[in-house]
């Protein structure tokens, strides 16, 4: 396994990358500078970039200039909350749909939770805005929003919502939002083969549960499986391959401990629950996730890249 040290902004495109001494030679190019907390980005067909700033700005970087998109929804940018991920519909060229995740109260007076919205852009303004999922209830705990978005080869929409800092209530209860991976049709409707569709009390959009704070997500282009990474507490960051209806164990099983050094569980594996395919102790604070598919890097094709916020390297 190789480690490429970097000053991390967001995975590859916004990185100031340096290399350790290995046979491969890498260089970097600063694509966009003077960003505060960029959380997600997508390239458009003209190679311009849509970038989310956590503070609540959507930036269109085109021809070397930053244009702020107008008409954004209500966004509560506090601590870990704000404007988070962004993803294009697989048929964006034909339908123009763009998807974002963000923390909002949905006009409630108290707290916030993760929302998923789709919209189009016309004349640098959001139009046709549709909230296709809003996690409930709102919480005043402004952390663990999850919020990564991904489409699969069948145009199913997947997204994550973290446990919202309430590990003892949310992750193991399928009748509550939080600590879950969700699956919807692109318009927000619930697939009839979702795993808990016949459970009267369950949140029907749930696809898997028992997660802490999944903030990396990618479809493996070779196996078509959904891969995620999630933040552990003190130790216990994980990589998981998502299976329909599966329980990933949080907080009943973990390789991590409380931030103060005490244990909250003595178990790292439980029969009937999924174990991570990889975990980190100590934590690396994973951020960003992408499979290498380009023939430009033949020796790395198929490898997975994950950035570390703590140690400031790119993990392969």
Predicted regions and their residues:
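Bacterial N-terminal signal peptides that target proteins for export
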Residues: 1-9
């Amino acid at each position: 396994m190789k480690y490429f040290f970097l000053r991390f902004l967001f995975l590859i495109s916004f990185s100031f990358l340096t290399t350790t001494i290995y046979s491969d030679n890498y260089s970097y190019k600063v694509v966009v500078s003077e960003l505060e907390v960029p959380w997600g980005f997508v390239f458009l067909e003209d190679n311009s970039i849509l970038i989310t700033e956590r503070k609540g700005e959507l930036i269109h970087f085109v021809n070397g200039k930053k244009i702020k998109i107008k008409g954004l929804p209500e966004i509560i940018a506090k601590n870990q909350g704000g404007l988070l991920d962004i993803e294009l519909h697989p048929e964006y060229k034909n339908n123009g749909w763009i998807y974002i995740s963000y923390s909002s109260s949905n006009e409630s007076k108290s707290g916030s939770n993760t929302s998923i919205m789709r919209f189009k852009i016309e004349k640098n303004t959001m139009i046709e805005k549709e909230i296709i999922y809003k996690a409930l209830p709102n919480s005043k705990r402004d952390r663990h929003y999850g919020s990564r978005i991904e489409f699969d080869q069948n145009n199913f929409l997947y997204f994550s919502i973290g446990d919202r800092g309430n590990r003892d209530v949310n992750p193991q209860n399928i009748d509550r939002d939080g600590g879950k991976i969700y699956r919807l049709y692109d318009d927000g409707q619930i697939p009839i083969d979702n795993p808990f569709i016949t459970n009267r009390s369950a949140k029907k959009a749930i696809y898997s549960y028992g997660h802490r704070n999944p903030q990396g997500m990618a479809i493996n282009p070779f196996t078509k499986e959904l891969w995620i990474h999630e933040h552990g507490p003190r130790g216990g960051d994980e990589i998981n391959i998502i299976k329909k209806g599966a329980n990933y164990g949080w907080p009943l099983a973990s390789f991590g401990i409380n931030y103060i050094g005490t244990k909250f569980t003595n178990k790292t594996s439980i029969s009937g629950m999924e174990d991570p395919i990889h975990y980190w102790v100590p934590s690396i604070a994973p951020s960003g996730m992408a499979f290498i598919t380009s023939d430009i890097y033949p020796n790395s094709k198929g490898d997975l890249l994950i950035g570390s916020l703590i140690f400031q390297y790119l993990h392969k």
